[in-house]
């Protein structure tokens, strides 16, 4: 059987080990070819090929349910659940999603994108099954990185107290998340997988035995001895999970189909919660990825032979993340109070550079955004200048801590929100749409966004120097605009002050962050139609520069707000509130992301679909100006 013939995972039933190995090779080949061509997650999926095949051969996927934590390791799952023919569309507009998506396949039982959710969701399914008197298996596959997340440990704690609730947790232990794992749990798991008795008993035991004199004759007795020794070792290394109420099995060689099949069959016999500890290699089967597991966690299109990214058509300016990291390092070198904090995203945020240069001023808390926020709050209490560098979408996970531990106590924590706005191929779980809305409503919070990478440097200085309370800066994924950068001598910006970039009497364009450059392009287009626009770089969504905005709105009378974020509760809403508070009844048109999910596509495709290209915005503004009402005031 060829991989292309598999449209249902139950077709794996009855296949021999040899046939499964052939399918495994074909999965890796398809996986590599697709990611090399279009980009995507590489290492995670390559590491779970045998795990996926062995697990699915022991399940009835017409009724049993498997949830993959995060989902970026689920490419093999997608390839054997009817998506082989469309897999070349991976992460492309209207194509196969890069993560699990309930709308995409009946085999994607729970959507994901953020870590540590699988055990909770699978336990919920198991409890619902039992309440309805049904009979199917529920399985969570979770990485050792995600297992460090508090939510996963909360679910383990709950499930362990339900001895008659049948569920299986598979711990995919490759000693990595995106970057190398940190923390006591990671250290414990590493000790388990490297335990000498288990290493000895797992490494080609039978093959080595047969090479000894009389090896064939004593093999049965020694295999029984091996089993006893391994159970003794496991009783020690699996003690934490056993004490929490799980039956622990492992560590198991995650690339041995024989061992995986036997283990999963055994695990399915237990009535209560079971944890199978599977040791895998991230990037398995592609030597370049195995040797550099951080870089090859995910890749843009690359050359399979060399592993190097395919050259772009033209050189790009440095990314916002790179400018952020390099500027932060220079500030940290001059102030030992400055500490960079990340939640398992050192490479993505650029803080790996800070770690390399100033390791004592760098903290990685693991996949623990809640802890990162309150840790920063505690450091701020002692006069430190904590800089929490985190993706916009992931800061959502620490929201209560932002309110309870930072804002209520008015502590000077600096939140740097990378990947704010439209991020592209990762889809709705990773879009940075909501931070303006969810931070703007919090007392004491200051919010700013740079128009370009040079202003990011100024805002970084502003945030670190600001000691009157919490402050946040959002900035996008990808390259800057190519403006000149200063090596030093940055001056902090006055809090809550905007800047006027262009003057005109026909329409007021109030832009925030990345939309400032677009507003300038729109103004150029409007000029060609005889329309003169005032363009304002708001800089701050909170506090708004009402001293500048209110008189301009009164004078010009037609206001358009521009933001790369959700419209409900966003920057445009803030402007509307300010105008109403000042009894200015100028018409306001808010342009941004409407109240909908933004699916996976390139950022340019998403912006075009949302009407956020310069030409689309200019056309909309021209339509507004056909009937321009005069400004008025509330009586």
Swiss-Prot record:
Disulphide bridges, residue numbers: none
Residues holding thiamine diphosphate: 72, 113-115, 145-146, 174, 286, 369
Catalytic activity, as annotated: D-glyceraldehyde 3-phosphate + pyruvate + H(+) = 1-deoxy-D-xylulose 5-phosphate + CO2
GO biological process, one term: thiamine biosynthetic process
One Pfam family per UniProt: DXP_synthase_N
Cited InterPro entries: Dxylulose-5-P_synthase (IPR005477), THDP-binding (IPR029061), Transketo_C/PFOR_II (IPR009014), Transketolase-like_Pyr-bd (IPR005475), Transketolase_BS (IPR020826), Transketolase_C (IPR033248), Transketolase_CS (IPR049557)
Functional pathway: Metabolic intermediate biosynthesis; 1-deoxy-D-xylulose 5-phosphate biosynthesis; 1-deoxy-D-xylulose 5-phosphate from D-glyceraldehyde 3-phosphate and pyruvate: step 1/1
Cofactor: binding details: Binds 1 Mg(2+) ion per subunit.
Keywords for the protein's UniProt record, in alphabetical order: Isoprene biosynthesis, Magnesium, Metal-binding, Thiamine biosynthesis, Thiamine pyrophosphate, Transferase
Cofactor(s) annotated in UniProt: Mg(2+); thiamine diphosphate
UniProt GO cellular component terms: cytosol
Subunit relationships: Homodimer.
Annotated family: Belongs to the transketolase family. DXPS subfamily.
Role according to the record: Catalyzes the acyloin condensation reaction between C atoms 2 and 3 of pyruvate and glyceraldehyde 3-phosphate to yield 1-deoxy-D-xylulose-5-phosphate (DXP).
Protein's recorded name: 1-deoxy-D-xylulose-5-phosphate synthase
Protein source organism: Acaryochloris marina (strain MBIC 11017)
């Amino acid at each position: 059987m060829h991989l292309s013939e598999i449209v249902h995972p139950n077709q794996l039933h009855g296949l021999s080990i040899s046939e499964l190995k052939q399918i495994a090779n074909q999965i890796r080949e398809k996986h590599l070819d697709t990611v090399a061509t279009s980009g995507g997650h590489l290492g995670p999926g390559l590491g779970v090929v045998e795990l996926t095949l062995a697990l699915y051969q022991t399940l009835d996927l017409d009724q049993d349910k498997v949830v993959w934590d995060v989902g970026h390791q689920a490419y093999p799952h997608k390839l054997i659940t009817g998506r082989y023919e469309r897999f070349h569309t991976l992460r492309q507009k209207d194509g196969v999603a890069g993560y699990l998506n309930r709308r995409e396949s009946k085999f994607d039982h729970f959507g994901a994108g953020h870590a540590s959710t699988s055990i909770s969701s699978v336990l919920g399914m198991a409890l619902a099954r039992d309440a309805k008197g049904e009979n199917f298996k529920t399985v969570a596959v979770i990485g050792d990185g995600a297992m460090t997340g508090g939510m996963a440990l909360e679910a383990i704690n709950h499930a362990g107290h339900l001895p008659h609730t049948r569920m299986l947790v598979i711990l995919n232990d490759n000693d990595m998340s995106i970057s190398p794992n940190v923390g006591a749990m990671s250290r414990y798991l590493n000790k388990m997988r490297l335990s000498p008795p288990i290493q000895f008993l797992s490494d080609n035991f039978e093959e080595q035995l047969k090479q000894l004199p009389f090896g064939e004759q004593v093999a049965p007795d020694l295999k029984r001895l091996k089993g006893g020794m391994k159970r003794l070792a496991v009783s020690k290394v699996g003690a934490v999970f056993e004490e929490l109420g799980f039956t622990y099995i492992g560590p198991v060689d995650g690339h041995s189909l024989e061992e995986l099949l036997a283990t999963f069959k055994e695990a399915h016999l237990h009535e209560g919660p079971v944890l199978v500890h599977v040791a895998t290699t991230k990037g398995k089967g592609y030597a370049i990825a195995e040797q550099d597991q951080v870089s090859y966690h995910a890749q843009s299109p690359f050359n399979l032979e060399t592993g190097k990214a395919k050259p772009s058509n033209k050189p790009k300016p440095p990314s916002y993340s790179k400018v952020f990291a390099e500027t932060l390092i220079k500030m940290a070198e001059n102030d030992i109070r400055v500490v960079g904090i990340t939640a398992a995203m050192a490479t993505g945020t650029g803080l790996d550079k800070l770690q390399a240069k100033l390791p004592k001023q760098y903290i990685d808390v693991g996949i623990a955004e809640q802890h990162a926020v309150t840790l920063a709050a505690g450091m701020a209490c002692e006069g430190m200048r904590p800089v929490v560098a985190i993706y916009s979408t992931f800061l959502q996970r620490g929201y209560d801590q932002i309110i309870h531990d930072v804002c209520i106590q008015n502590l000077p924590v600096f939140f740097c929100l990378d990947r704010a706005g439209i991020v592209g191929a990762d889809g709705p779980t990773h879009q940075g749409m909501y931070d303006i809305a969810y931070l703007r409503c919090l007392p004491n919070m200051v919010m700013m966004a740079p128009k370009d990478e040079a202003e990011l440097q100024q805002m970084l200085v502003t945030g670190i120097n600001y000691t009157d309370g919490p402050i946040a800066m959002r900035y996008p994924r990808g390259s800057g605009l190519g403006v000149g950068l200063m090596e030093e001598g940055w001056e902090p910006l006055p809090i809550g002050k905007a800047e006027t970039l262009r003057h005109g009497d026909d329409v007021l364009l109030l832009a925030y962050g990345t939309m400032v450059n677009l507003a300038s392009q729109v103004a150029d287009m409007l000029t060609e139609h005889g329309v003169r626009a005032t363009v304002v770089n708001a800089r701050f969504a909170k506090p708004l520069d009402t001293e500048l905005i209110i008189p301009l709105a009164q004078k010009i009378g037609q206001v358009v707000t521009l933001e790369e974020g959700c419209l409900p509760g966003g920057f445009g809403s803030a402007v509307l509130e300010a105008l109403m508070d000042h009894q200015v009844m100028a018409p306001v048109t808010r342009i941004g992301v409407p109240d909908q999910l933004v699916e996976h596509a390139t950022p340019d495709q998403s912006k075009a679909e949302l009407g956020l290209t310069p030409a689309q915005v200019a056309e909309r503004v021209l339509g507004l100006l056909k009937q321009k009402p005069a400004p008025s005031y509330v009586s």
